[in-house]
Amino acid sequence: MMMNKSKTDWAKDTPCKNITIYGYCKYENDGCIFNHGKPLSTSSNTGGAAAGSAEDSAASGGVTVGNTGKSTFNAKTATSFTPSVAIPDFNNIPSFTPERIVSSPAGDGATAFTPSFNPYGSDSFNPSANVSGPGSAVFAAASGNAGASATAAPRSQSVHVGTGGYLPLAGTAFPTVYPPSHSILQYHLYAPDPPPHLQVPLKANERTPETLFIPNNLREHLLKRNLSALQVFPSDGNLPDIVGDYFGLVPLEFHNRQTGKGRYLGHQNSLYKVFSNFDGKVYIIRRIHDVKTTDVGQISLPFRKWQKVSCPNVVKVKDAFTTLAFGDSSLCVVHDYYPQSNSLYETHVANYTVVPVTQKYLWSYLVQLSNALNEVHRHGLSMNNISLDKVIVTGDPGRIKVGDSAVHDILAFDEGRDIAKEQQADYSAVGALLMDLAQRMLGTRDQPLDSMDIDPLFKRVLAYLLSDEKKTIAEFTALFSHKMLDIISSSQTYSEYIEQHLSRELENGRLFRLMCKLNFIFGRMESSMDIHWSEAGDKFPIILFYDYVFHQVDENGKSVMDLTHVLRCLNKLDTGVSEKIILVTPDEMNCIIISYKELKDSIDSTFRSMTQ
């Protein structure tokens, strides 16, 4: 079959991609219409020049010459890639210069490679950017310098409880889980919904782009949570790189408010966000400074009890251990991490935008704290020192959790404890917390309960909690049992709202899989020589449909990027509707009338033939 020469003249100056990819073209003498000219050789035929280039390469530490005359590349000793052609001068191009660059000692005869930007060496990105601290040994080990890693300070051994028998690998200096990306999520670039007074009324069968995805406020809230979970801050050099099975410590307390002396039995404390080297998840570590432990059961026994507590209003305990990584014997208790969560103190008192306390919030907090009390007391434990700092708000509508679980039980392990008395104190602590919030709602401090202008039933509940009589969870919840129905209704409504939007996103990867299938079969090199992909072939409508969906242009020749058009076409193609469309060639000389069902069958058969 002879091709029209006028139709192949356009390819005579186009280099054949087979030459570029494979170095040869098996169709060169069998009808390939592309240019098969050999690229100019940059190597010299003189032995002196070859020897000189080999010596220069060997001096750079990347290439060695053997007895056979063949040069070999050694990646371990190579410092940088040096191409054999002329390199443009980039010295005049402005580039980012970090404030501090972490450099690793290079091997003998090698020049250290210093990148123009190192995110893990810059104070703006890396939370452990100190060069002289323990992190220097980590970078030395990662660079392959055995001498530096041999002189690194050994890691302190930690006594772990909640790792399920997992122990870190001996000699492992760098975490096996890579730190998260530092790129900022551009959620603010999404087009927001128009204000209510500008929204156009829609018919029952009409949709807007906003209705095709999750609501903007919910998406923005979830993206902010992800950003908060991955966010890190520059280290001041006083924090270790790795603590037990966790790395990437980020301080979380910034308001500098002193904790009550009785909360941690007089010990100082710190709170950090960490990344687990065991499962890659994000947790928080409550560090109690300078804790002396003499009995192994002091940590293991309380931890095992608290691990059995499973309540939506109590923060789950994940791990507990002691470590010397901070320079003292510190107790570290690991809990689940809830991004964008604040304590009740930060939510209603300390933040710049304080959330006003309402009677609805008070009833919601009361019901949830009652649920936490019931679950903790049922396991023979007590919460101890419930306060505005210990209860965190994890989301709307007013969802709270009691944190710092198991810390007090470990610190007071050796002391003679009366659990029944501590459980009665929990009721009084809940009453004092709600009393404080009620006074803040009214704007008065130290106001007697009898003179407070609040719901009489709520006032009766507070009087019961603050009284000296013995309390039980049954008597306590019986006072406001009908109020629980409102909280249950609100919680179920919110769950159905989230489930509704989740069901809409259930198959959101369906169109992505379809686009992947189209790109797998479209534009392949071997297709240019296949008669089935020519204008008279049965696969040519796939090419025209691809251009119809993604390569639209207006009357001025400007590219049109219409998301609605793409979604409409791909949805019809995925379902295989019988609707027919007209596909026109770029030169507008030919057109094809074909249905989406026929297109789908053609794409599926082509994809199956590639996978067989």
Swiss-Prot record:
GO terms for cellular component: P-body; PAN complex. GO terms for biological process: mRNA processing; nuclear-transcribed mRNA poly(A) tail shortening; postreplication repair. A zinc finger (C3H1-type) spans 10-39. Homodimer. Forms a heterotrimer with a catalytic subunit PAN2 to form the poly(A)-nuclease (PAN) deadenylation complex. Interacts (via PAM-2 motif) with poly(A)-binding protein PAB1 (via PABC domain), conferring substrate specificity of the enzyme complex. The keyword Nucleotide-binding applies. Residues 231-481 are annotated as: Pseudokinase domain. The keyword Glycosyltransferase does not apply. Residues 44-62 have a biased composition (Low complexity). One of its GO terms (molecular function) is ATP binding. This is PAN2-PAN3 deadenylation complex subunit PAN3. Keywords: ATP-binding, Coiled coil, Cytoplasm, Metal-binding, mRNA processing, Nucleotide-binding, Zinc, Zinc-finger. PROSITE patterns: ZF_C3H1 (PS50103). It is found in: Cytoplasm. Residues 521-612 are annotated as: Knob domain. The N-terminal zinc finger binds to poly(A) RNA. Contains a pseudokinase domain. The protein kinase domain is predicted to be catalytically inactive because some of the residues important for catalytic activity are substituted and it lacks the equivalent of the binding site for a peptide substrate. However, it has retained an ATP-binding site and ATP-binding is required for mRNA degradation, stimulating the activity of the PAN2 nuclease in vitro. A motif (PABPC-interacting motif-2 (PAM-2)) lies at residues 84-104, 111-131.
